[in-house]
Amino acid sequence: MKTTIARLIAKENEFDNMRACALEIAAAVAANEPGNKLYAICEAGEPNTLVFVERYVDEKAIEMYRNSDHMKSLGRKIGATLAGKPEILFRLTDCT
């Protein structure tokens, strides 16, 4: 399994739009990506901030996610709400 934990910070007055886009992405992932085992969106307790936890069975599943039509369109949509690039906090690989 491959897990990524990332922090996204919204522009001023864009948090609600960012959160709505994040929920759209999570729904699209759940509906279309059998290689995804977890796509959690967490409010971080910091202003305008969400933390994403994404878990995939392997690199092939991650590539499918990155190249999916829904991620291309929704990725642009959420990108317009962000104050900067997403910050990757951790990349984890299960050893068992």
Residue ranges, per PLM feature:
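Short, flexible helix/strand-to-coil boundary loops that buttress conserved ligand/catalytic motifs
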Residues: A22, R66, G75-I78
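Short conserved AdoMet
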Residues: P34, V57, A83
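Absolute protein N-terminus
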Residues: M1-K2, T96
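Short, well-ordered beta-strand segments in beta-rich or mixed alpha/beta enzyme
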Residues: K2-I9, A40-R66
